[in-house]
Structure formats: structure tokens, C-alpha cells
Amino acid sequence: MRNNLDVIAAYSIMLGLIILVGFLQSWSMALSILCLCLISAVMTIGANIQWGYAGLINFGIMGYTALGGLAAVLVSTPPVEDAWKAGGLDMLLCAFIIFSMILIIRLVLQKFSKSKNRNYIIAAVIIAGLILLRLISAPAIESIEAINPATTGFLGGMGLPILFSWIVGAFFAGGLAYVIGKIALGLRADYLAIATLLISEIVIAVIKHEDWLSRGVKNVIGLKRPVPYEIDLQGKEWFINLVQKFHQGSLNLISDNLEKQQALKQLVIESSTVFVKLCFAGLFTVVVIVLLIVTQKALYSPWGRMMRAIRDNEEAANAMGKNVVKQHLLIFVLGSAIVGIAGAMMVTYDGLFTPGSYRPMRYTFLIWVMVI
């Protein structure tokens, strides 16, 4: 009971401070802070699932966040037809080659598990694949990046509503977490933390330097919104009437009609910004509430009790027949997928994707401070 009261008091103080910002500065700034808090809360839920449920330390939050942001770009931006004509098919061929290399290596590991030549065969496949990839991708990338580099210079995306990117971002981050988990989850806690941090830096480096995919440090701007634009709201009669009705008292104090119209116009501009951020806050609140309900249900389910048992004593859980490695991998993927959702939410809110802005202090260690 005492803990519940402390939690309620903490959230009440935070909400009070946000309201105070609204009164003393502006409601637009207060709602911006609220939206960023909600996005950070989603990231924290993802990290807390890994640490609180399974005792896994993941310092790669920045990388999963960036993948979520990349998903927003690849889903919402329209395809650049000229870039696809210049080298899109070649890049698809490169993706097919990579997929084929993975299948061949997996087949070699299965068929030549006891052969002394297994490693030589795998090395030959990798070297041959990399040479082939280089020969095909280099001219294709050069051609793609030469297509109107000031505004495009990349393949673009699918042109779908950006809300779909929240799901795609979860799959991107979860897929990377699956690969990392297969390799690194057997490491000791401190080595796992270092490995995940380094892999996240690699992800950021790839996104920053592969212009054909994400425009790199040239950034992607003007992403689609799931809410109305301010300029559109300012021309809507229903919105103008709503603002006029809400501020009727202050407008009635102005006797001059010209001044009243100018005051109303300024109020409409300010209110449009507040309305848009209220819409974003509503969307983000729904996501946070759904995640909190699902995670709480999972925590007190038989599966949640099993995860806590594994966290407290892996040896005992393993002796009771629980697959510790499998459950660790599952929780690692789930937590990372939630962080990927948060990354897509952030790019959706900002309306732009800036790979150069991803820093460990903001997107990893600050989130861990919130978890702790």
C-alpha cells in the first residue's frame, strides 16, 4: 500500500510540474514535454521487461530506437521511382544474395558438423559472397545516391500510413534482438552489456553512412503524420468556431472588430499547435496504457512467475526443466521490440529522421536511469 501511494505521489508531482509549465510558459511546450515523457515511458517499459523479468542488461537501446525510426522512414515515405530504376533491382539482388549466403552457411553447419573443412567452406562462401555483393552494390548505390541528392538520393519507402511503422519498427528491433540474442545471451552480464552497446553503435554507423537506404546524415524530413497539420486546422471552419467559442470571454473584451479578428487569428494559430500535440499525446497514452496492461497481466501470469524464478535462480529453474536460454531469448526480443515501437513513435512525432542525433547518453543511459 505504501509503495502504491509513493507511485501515485510521484506521478502527481510530475503531472503538476507539466501543468505548471503550461501556465508559466506555454501549453505547447507542456504538451511537448508530456509527449516525450510518454515515448520515454515506452522505451523504459521495454528495458524494464528485460531487466525486471529476466535480469538481462541491454545497453543497445539506442540501436533499437534508431531501427524503429528507420521503419518510420521506410514505411511512410513514397518510393523514389527514378532511384528504383537506377539501382533498386540490383539492391534487391544483393538482398537475395545475402539471404542465400545465410541459407548456405546454415546448410554447411548442418551437413558438415563433424568435418574439418567446415570452417574453410564457410569462409569461402563469405568471401565469394562479399566480392559478389561489392561488384553489384557499388555501382547501384552510386546511381541511387546521384538521383536528386538534395531532396532524395535514396530508394524511399512504401508510402503507407506512418502508424504501420510502429508495428514494422517492432519487427525490425525484434529481429535484430533475435540475432544478437542467439550470439550474445550466453555471455556474462557485463560482457553482454558491452556487446549490446557496441552492436547499437554499429547499427547507428550503418544508418548514418548508407545514404541509399536512409539518406544518412542528410536526414529525412516531411514525414507523414497520423494527426492533422496545423496549417490545415487553421483553415477549418469548425476549428475556428471551436477556438472562438473557447475564448469567447477574452474576445468579447475587444471592442474593435479588426483587433478582434487579429486576436482570433493568433488564437487559432496557437490553438492548432496545442490541438495537434493533444492528438499525439492521446495516441501515445493509448500505447502506454495498452503496454502497461499487457505487461502487468504477463507479470502475474504463470509465465511471469516462471521468468521471475529464472531471474532469481537460473540453476534451480534449469534443474526443474525450464528452458532458460529460450526464455531469455524471448524476453530479450520482446523488450527490444517495444523499444522499436518507441523509436517509430518518436520519428512520427518529430516528423523527421536524423540519424546523427542518436546518442547513447540520451537513448540508452537516460532510459536506464528511468528503469532504476
Spans of model-derived segments:
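Transmembrane alpha-helices and adjacent helix-loop boundaries
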Residues: M1-I372
